[in-house]
Design a protein with these regions (language model features):
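Short active-site oxyanion
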Residues: 25-27, 95-101, 165-167
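Active-site-proximal beta-strand elements of phosphoester/diester hydrolases
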Residues: 27-30, 45-48, 134-140, 166-172
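Cap/insert and terminal regions of metallo-dependent hydrolase folds
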Residues: 76, 100, 106-110, 176-264
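Metallo-beta-lactamase
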Residues: 3-23, 103-165, 245-271
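Glycine/Thr-rich phosphate-binding loops of Rossmann-like dinucleotide-binding domains
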Residues: 55, 87, 111, 145, ...
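Active-site metal-binding loops of divalent metal-dependent hydrolases
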Residues: 48-52, 81-82, 138-142, 171-173, ...
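Divalent metal-coordination and catalytic microenvironments
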Residues: 38, 48, 81, 88, ...
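Pre-active-site segment of Zn-dependent metallo-hydrolases
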Residues: 11-20, 31, 37-82, 89-94, ...
C-alpha cells in the first residue's frame, strides 16, 4: 500500500455529455469506485458519491470521471454504508441541496447535519417511495462500522425501481447465498456489482472476487452486469487492472461475456 502514496493519479475529469433520457430508459454514469449517477423517470439519483482525493491515508489513484460541478440537479442521494470510501461527508455536504437521502439503519446520524431535507433510514427489505421511485434496502455480507466502537450501523445494497425498470447497486459485499433471495424478490435488470479489494490486507472475506461476482449475477437473474469498486483506491493487494480482466474471463467461461458492461468513468450509458 505504501508505494501508492507516490503513484501519480491517472485519468482526468472532463465535462460529461449527459443524453436526453426518453420515457422508460435508464442512464448510468460511473463516476469511479462505487459512485454512480443514475437517471431514470426524469429523476437524478446519486449513489455513494465520493470526489475526495484521499481516504484518510489512502490515496485516490484514479480521478473521478467528471468534476462535481458538472452534476445535474440531484433529486435523491443513496449511501450503502458508513465506510469512508462510500460515505464521504465532504462530498455529501457539497451535493446536499435540501433533497432526501436514504441510508441503512444506524447511519443517519452521520449525514443529518449536511444539508439534506430528510434522512430515511431503512431496515433490510424495507422500501421507501420517493417521487416515482421505489427504493429498497437489501442485505449483503459485509460490515458497517465507521470507527471501532460503532458496530450498530447497518449496511446493504439498494434496489431502485421506477416505471417497470429496476437497477441494483450492491454496495460492498462478499459472495453470500442471499443474492438468490434478492433475485427472487425483485425483477432486476441491471446489477452494479463490486469486483475489487478481494486480496484484503486484513484477510477478512468481505469483498467478492470477480468470479464470485459472476456467480452472484447469475443468482440475481439480472440482464446486465456493471462492475464497480475497483481501480480507484488500492484497498487490496491485487493489481488495479486485474479485476475487470478476471471478470471478463469468468463471464466468458459461462457464456455471459455479452452481458458484462465494463464502463469508463464519466461516460454515460443509456440502457
Amino acid at each position: 500500500m505504501i508505494p501508492s502514496l507516490f503513484t501519480k493519479r491517472s485519468g482526468g475529469p472532463a465535462a460529461p455529455q449527459f443524453p436526453k433520457i426518453r420515457e422508460g430508459q435508464i442512464c448510468v454514469t460511473w463516476i469511479g469506485h462505487a459512485s454512480f449517477l443514475i437517471q431514470m423517470h426524469e429523476v437524478n439519483i446519486l449513489v455513494d458519491p465520493i470526489w475526495s482525493k484521499w481516504l484518510k491515508v489512502i490515496k485516490r489513484l484514479k480521478q473521478p470521471g467528471f468534476e462535481i460541478h458538472h452534476l445535474p440537479s440531484i433529486d435523491f442521494v443513496l449511501v450503502t454504508h458508513a465506510h469512508f470510501d462510500h460515505l464521504d461527508r465532504r462530498t455529501l455536504r457539497r451535493v446536499a441541496s435540501d433533497q432526501p437521502i436514504v441510508v441503512p439503519m444506524g447511519v443517519g446520524n452521520l449525514v443529518h447535519d449536511l444539508g439534506f431535507h430528510i434522512v430515511h433510514e431503512l431496515d433490510y427489505w424495507q422500501t421507501v417511495e420517493l417521487g416515482p421511485l421505489k427504493i429498497s434496502l437489501t442485505p449483503c455480507h459485509h460490515w458497517g462500522a465507521r470507527f471501532l466502537a460503532d458496530l450498530h450501523r447497518d449496511f446493504g445494497g439498494f434496489v431502485i425501481a421506477a416505471n417497470g425498470r429496476t437497477i441494483f447497486h450492491c454496495g460492498d459485499s462478499a459472495y453470500f447465498p442471499g443474492f438468490k433471495e434478492i433475485g427472487d424478490r425483485y425483477n432486476i435488470e441491471v446489477a452494479l456489482l463490486p469486483i475489487g479489494a478481494y486480496e484484503a490486507p486484513t484477510g477478512r472475506e468481505v469483498h467478492m472476487n470477480p468470479e464470485e461476482a459472476v456467480k452472484a449475477f447469475v443468482e440475481l437473474r439480472a440482464e446486465t452486469l456493471i462492475p464497480m469498486h475497483y481501480g480507484t483506491f488500492r484497498l487490496g493487494f491485487e493489481p488495479l487492472h486485474e479485476p475487470p480482466q478476471r471478470l471478463l474471463a469468468a463471464a466468458r467461461e459461462h457464456g455471459l461475456e455479452q452481458k458484462v458492461l465494463v464502463m469508463t468513468e464519466g461516460k454515460p450509458v443509456v440502457l
